[in-house]
Regions:
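A cytosolic small-molecule/anion-sensing beta-strand core signal
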Residues: 19, 64, 140-141
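Residue-level detector of high-confidence beta-strand sites
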Residues: 27-29, 78, 147
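Glycine-rich phosphate-binding loop of actin/hexokinase-like ATP-binding domains
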Residues: 120-178
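A charged helix-plus-loop insertion that forms the helical arch/lid used to bind
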Residues: 73-85
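A secondary-structure boundary/capping signal
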Residues: 9, 63-64, 79, 130
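A short acidic/small-residue loop/turn micro-motif
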Residues: 31-33, 59, 83, 151-154
Length: 287
């Protein structure tokens, strides 16, 4: 059976068709319609129909930003906010007249890296998304572990600082409000009064506030993932998303994590992803 996967991202929608040996047969990317749920449905439907033309025996998986409520089937906790409260899976199944498997982007990322990517040699893998948002997914023996209510791995909404920054989820102090890309940019602006994008910040090392900004980033990163290790003790942690390209996360960042873990022996591998920004779409294929 062929496998068709769709990755619904904040800026792009990617679809890929794989054969039984995971070879890419067809692939296409388009821009994501902004703040328009109906146009998102139409775009995904058109992509699926285009890539599945003349292919009748295929599974369909969708990778989406945000968790899916096990009770209601509605999207929740999504930073693509026009999806929140929507029955995306049901609406697409009705539109395409086909059964769909659907998981959030962090779960798809983790599954792809654990089955096809950098973490194929590990049994218990925690996949981390660090980008516009912060998320995570757990894979055990090449199978996703969703948890009782489909929120396993959602470390981005752990409380890092009580009464801290306000999060779009309605709570305060979430990890995401400290180490996501926009949060890091906001912190830089508070420190310096300058509005800069993250790539510029990372090279502005002569700024007198740069060391303070970096130190706070590393501390929050370390505390956040140390909590994950204390609870889950994974065989490996894989970093994905735009921030995974920051080299010091694998050196000073790893040291910051290890310093906070409750153990006298800490050797958890902190790995850079292998599949890049296509991990989501390959993970969708594997659902």
């Amino acid at each position: 059976m062929y496998k068709l996967g769709v990755d619904l991202g904040g800026t792009k929608i990617e679809a890929v068709l794989l054969d039984e040996n995971f070879n890419v047969i067809k692939r296409k990317r388009i821009l994501t319609p902004q703040n328009n749920y109906q146009k998102i449905l139409d775009s995904i439907s058109s992509l699926v129909k285009e890539l599945s033309e003349n292919t009748f025996d295929y599974s369909l998986g969708i990778c989406t930003p945000g968790a899916i409520s096990k009770q209601t089937g509605l999207i929740k906790n999504s930073n693509t906010q026009c999806l929140i409260g929507k029955s995306l899976k049901e609406d697409l199944e009705n539109k395409l007249d086909k059964k769909i498997s659907m998981e959030n982007d962090a779960n798809c990322f983790a599954l792809a890296e654990a089955t096809l990517g950098i973490a194929v040699d590990f049994d218990l893998v925690f996949g981390v998304i660090l980008g516009t948002g912060v998320g995570g997914g757990i894979v055990i023996n090449k199978k996703l572990y969703p948890g009782r209510t489909n929120i396993a791995g959602e470390w981005g909404h752990h409380t890092l600082h009580r009464n801290g920054n306000l999060c779009y989820c309605g709570k305060t102090g979430c990890v995401e409000t400290y180490i996501s890309g926009p949060s890091l940019e906001n912190n830089w602006t508070k420190l310096t009064g300058k509005s800069q994008h993250l790539p510029e910040i990372l090279t502005d090392i002569d700024n007198k506030y740069w060391v303070k900004w970096k130190t706070e980033f590393l501390e929050n990163f370390g505390y956040g993932l140390a909590n994950v290790i204390d609870i889950l003790d994974p065989d490996a942690i894989v970093l994905g998303g735009g921030l995974s390209n920051i080299d010091f996360l694998y050196t000073e960042g790893k040291e910051s994590i290890y310093n906070q873990v409750f153990s006298d022996l800490v050797d958890t591998p902190i790995l850079k992803n292998k599949l890049g920004d296509s991990a989501g779409v390959f993970g969708a294929c594997m659902l």
